[in-house]
Amino acid sequence: LIPINTRADARADHLFQLKQPLSHTGNSTMQLSRLVLASALALAATPAFAQSAGTWTVGIGAHNVAPKSNNGTLTATPLGNLKMDVGNNARPTVTAEYFLKDNLGVEVLAALPFQHDIDVVGVGKVGSTKHLPPTVSLQYHFGQGKVRPFVGIGVNYTTFFSTKTEGPIAGTNLDLSDSWGLAGHIGVDFRISEKGALRVDYRTIDIDTKVKLNGAKLGTRNTVNIDPSVYGVAYVFSF
């Protein structure tokens, strides 16, 4: 009987030794699972660019205003039909946005005065003007991730000033009326830190102005359609 018990004990010891590696493997799997879970929680806890209800963002950047290629024709003027061409210009810009909800904000755009050359096709430069284009937009921001696109629609008011004449109309008084129009806005915020992001954006603005020379309507059709594309970059920080 003793040899039989000895063999049984030996088998029990052998089975116990086989079970130990399996137990070790189970512990390793559990530890790995805990590590993966901890990493996932840490990633989820990484702060997103703070754009939530009640917060403000301010953006400082530079934008180029590029009027559309065909700005309209002034018809039946003393100089005949004049096809207008308004030049591009880039200036520093600033935006301020207040978030009504986590994804919805109201933004105001301001800038240093833009200056544009005014050309008549076939004649050349006939003047220049400056304008300010304050724009108020309602904007929707998608998601809460590192890359956050947005869209917006708003109203633009453009005022023209410091208009000068030269060339064939030098010495005359050229007047450009102020303009109200719709504005569309799309862009993407790329998070850099909890409080900062790099923004790339594009706007299209409806700007139409009526032209007068020495106080008189210039031609039978005196509207110049500027309708620019506005694109640029900005650094946006929240508080």
Where are these regions (language model features)?
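Residues that define the transmembrane beta-barrel architecture of outer-membrane proteins
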Residues: 54, 88-92, 128-134, 147, ...
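Sec/Tat signal peptide C-region and signal peptidase I cleavage site
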Residues: 29, 46-50
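Gram-negative (and chloroplast) outer-membrane scaffold detector with strong preference
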Residues: 64-68, 95-167, 226-239
